[in-house]
Amino acid sequence: MRVLHVCSELFPLLKTGGLADVIGALPAAQLAEGADVRIILPAFPDLRRGIPETVLVREIDTFAGRVALRYGHYRGIGIYLIDAPALYDRAGSPYHDASLYAYSDNYQRFALLGWMACELACGLDGYWRPEVVHAHDWHAGLTCAYLAARGRPARSVFTVHNLAYQGLFSAHHLSELQLPAEFFQIYGLEFYGQISYLKAGLFFADHVTTVSPTYAKEITQPAFGYGMEGLLQALAHQGRLTGILNGVDSDIWDPQSDTLLPTRYDAENLQAKAINKTHLQTAMGLQLTESKPIFAVVSRLTAQKGLDLVLEALPELLALGGQLVVLGSGDTTLQEAFLAAAAEHSGQVGVQIGYHEAFSHRIIAGSDVILVPSRFEPCGLTQLYGLKYGTLPLVRHTGGLADTVVDCALENLADGSASGFVFNECEAQALVKAIRRAFVLWSRPKHWRHVQRHAMRLDFGWQLAAVDYLSLYRRL
């Protein structure tokens, strides 16, 4: 089966979020299952540098001018790069400028991504033509609209990684993008008077997936649907909405082989994890002690991630004898609040603003608990990394967090299924109660190690998701 993934990021060459991790792992897992998989992306500078050897497939005229399609390989996967320097040859983020303003021509930049994916489905590359086109998030949403406009030359799947980002643009761009005028309606890509690239993917795809079963249910409700819940309810009723859990790339995230760690370890050698803890405490200026559990945040610092709750719960966490480590960037108010906490609680709170992939590995390996108190979380990868590294996740019961972490309630401890700590209400007091339960388990080292070992043996590998996606493709 020939499958084309359409997206805007690829780990490790270009990453702004979890989407890149998915595209860096899922196609390879599908290839291992026997599929013929390729990826199409805009030729952003980081991607051009990472895939320097490419050949010209075709040059064609598009609504955005003359565009070249190039082809190369990265880690055994075929990669198409859309070579349009005027649109894509910009340093930094693929979405916004240095002042964090979204590029004014994003409507054109990401429409071209969908256009070129559709052209491949129509035979642009004489040597390879996809049977299934799999588009990811709003950046690739128009792919499904262009395929519909061209008579559906391939089956299409659209995956929502985060419904909050909807790709909204002015309606007057419709004719410029060469989309049929009749597509601009409620039963189409119109959303409150604008074009929504996300809605285009949802409406015109043959099948829609999300990145966890629970999130697939949540987004049919007004609280999580961002105005799309009616359409999503209809898709669910038609059997065209499925939740498939993301996985962990064990080539990158595995404490047994992770070269970014001071010391590698596994479930049978947890003493070595303590060495990582000492290194982390030193790096973050924390008091050197094995007796205090380290709670960690590795996240975008936003309200969605529930990090205001962490700030509210921090006095109790410290009073109970814990330490806190934070790595991330985002909302200025949250950044300043965490930095102030680090200054006030020197030796017990360490904060690093920004994101460093290598350091994130060392934090997850060196911590005892990873905090993911999200208000909503389509899947979440951080808690999966925590499980893999024996760093018990403390999460809110939402989205993929609900699907992957089993609370350390007495009955779950008794049957051996417990893997972390789960709270329900999106309130600081609920988080505090979960933190207290973490300290209760921490006070029983034998039980803590038992839960750690169980968590580390859980299988959230990409092969499971790869098989589920391939099975879905065959049903289309």
From Swiss-Prot:
Pathway: Glycan biosynthesis; glycogen biosynthesis
CDD domains: GT5_Glycogen_synthase_DULL1-like
Enzyme class: transferase
Record: residues binding ADP-alpha-D-glucose: 15
One cellular component (GO) term of this entry: cytosol
Protein keywords: Glycogen biosynthesis, Glycosyltransferase, Transferase
Record Pfam families: Glyco_transf_5, Glycos_transf_1
GO biological process assignments: glycogen biosynthetic process
Catalysis: reaction(s): [(1->4)-alpha-D-glucosyl](n) + ADP-alpha-D-glucose = [(1->4)-alpha-D-glucosyl](n+1) + ADP + H(+)
EC number: 2.4.1.21
Database matches in InterPro entries: Glyco_trans_1, GS/SS, Starch_synth_cat_dom
Keyword Glycosyltransferase carried by entry: yes
Single annotated GO MF: alpha-1,4-glucan glucosyltransferase (ADP-glucose donor) activity
Family that this chain belongs to: Belongs to the glycosyltransferase 1 family. Bacterial/plant glycogen synthase subfamily.
Protein purpose: Synthesizes alpha-1,4-glucan chains using ADP-glucose.
Protein name (database record): Glycogen synthase
Species of provenance: Yersinia pseudotuberculosis serotype O:1b (strain IP 31758)
